[in-house]
From Swiss-Prot:
This is Large ribosomal subunit protein bL33B. The keyword tRNA-binding does not apply. Gene3D superfamilies: Ribosomal protein L33. The gene is rpmG2. Belongs to the bacterial ribosomal protein bL33 family. NCBIfam families: PRK00504.1, PRK00595.1, rpmG_bact. InterPro entries: Ribosomal_bL33 (IPR001705), Ribosomal_bL33_sf (IPR038584), Ribosomal_zn-bd (IPR011332). Transmembrane segments: none annotated. The keyword Cell division does not apply. One of its GO terms (molecular function) is structural constituent of ribosome. It holds the Pfam family Ribosomal_L33.
Length: 50
């Protein structure tokens, strides 16, 4: 089985990369999820980055 690439989820407010996920080759657009940012101290929108 091929190695799966990991991508990071970055906070849209402070830019810190708090979460990592495995890349899904079937998904064409970038993932956007509401997650808790420990640096901002609140739930913010996190976007997929490379």
């Amino acid at each position: 089985m091929a190695n799966k690439k990991k991508v990071a989820l970055a906070c849209s407010e402070c830019g810190s990369r708090n979460y990592t996920i495995t890349e899904n080759p079937n998904r064409t657009e970038r993932l956007e999820v509401q997650k808790f940012c420990k640096y901002c101290g609140k739930h913010t929108l996190h976007r997929e980055t490379k």
